[in-house]
Amino acid sequence: MKVLANDGVSQSGIDALTNAGIEVITTKVAQEQLVNYINENNISVLLVRSATTARKALIDACPGLKIIGRGGVGMDNIDVTYAREKGLSVINTPAASSSSVAELVFAHLFGGVRYLYDSNRNMPLDGDTRFKDLKKNYAKGSELRGKTIGIIGFGRIGREVAKIALGCGMKVIASDNYVDTANITLDFFDGQKVTLEVKTKPIDELIQQSDFITLHVPAQKQYVIGKGQIAKMKDGAAIINAARGGVIDEVALIEALESGKLSFAGLDTFEKEPTPAVKVLMSHKVSLSPHIGAATNEAQDRIG
């Protein structure tokens, strides 16, 4: 059996497959040349991350393909239903990156409440001439402890976010269409464990009660957070999106940031990737990262 890992694979993944007698090819094949390469080299398994797509046309044109694997959680770049209808197995690694994504959420949160996203831009420019002014500008930070975080989508990643939030002394509110209650277990360095039950609430209650909102939902056809939802949020609240682009109305978000309705936003995913809106990129109230939620050495090793 031949496996084409078109978007890369970790050495541990190569070793595991090779030890099982499987040939692993790590050549990066351009999307437009992928069909020919798969057919000419008798590829049975196509492994992708987020760069390579596996759409209907490719599936139809590659009758020898048996498995499509996605290293990561979201499978937006694969026509999953169609592939399965055609008899292919479609697999992913849903738990491998949960901790990494959750930690990135808090990287944005910690940076947001202390204005690091803006001070990191201005200190290199004006730190030597306007130090006291900048110190004054960023002197009204706040703590996360005692604040309420609302988690929209309470699957694996949402629950990892809850663990960190509870460790920070935050109140956790969650909303999920498919989960009523969830047990969150905190594991400590000395082997102790503490388990807490979190009951989910309707999304409107979460929106109205949260100081910070973070989204952990799959791709949606409509905004989860649009102008109407933002209007219901607390004044000065903040929002983080490390889920999928298109779950937040970015136009409404920027308007809310500019008006002062929201204090800051942290975005790892965008409506238009890989060319996010300039207004989003240039906002001095947005903490930015280029869709790197799963991009840690540990997560990539678990993904394979």
Model-predicted segments: where are they?
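Adenosine-phosphate binding glycine-rich loop
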Residues: T275-A277, M282-G304
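Glycine-rich Rossmann-fold phosphate-binding loop(s) that bind the pyrophosphate
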Residues: F154-G155
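Short, Asp-centered acidic motifs that coordinate Mg2+ and/or phosphate
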Residues: S44-V45, I67, F212, A238, ...
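N-terminal Rossmann-fold NAD(P) dinucleotide-binding loop
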Residues: G158-R159
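Phosphate-coordination loops involved in phosphoryl transfer and adenosine-cofactor binding
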Residues: L65, R145-T148, K227, G236
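Phosphate-binding beta-alpha-beta segment of Rossmann-like dinucleotide-binding domains, i.e.
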Residues: K86, P94-T148
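Rossmann-like adenosine-cofactor binding region
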Residues: N39, A54-L58, N177-K279
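An N-terminal-biased, well-structured beta-alpha scaffold segment characteristic
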Residues: M1-I91, Q208, G226-G228
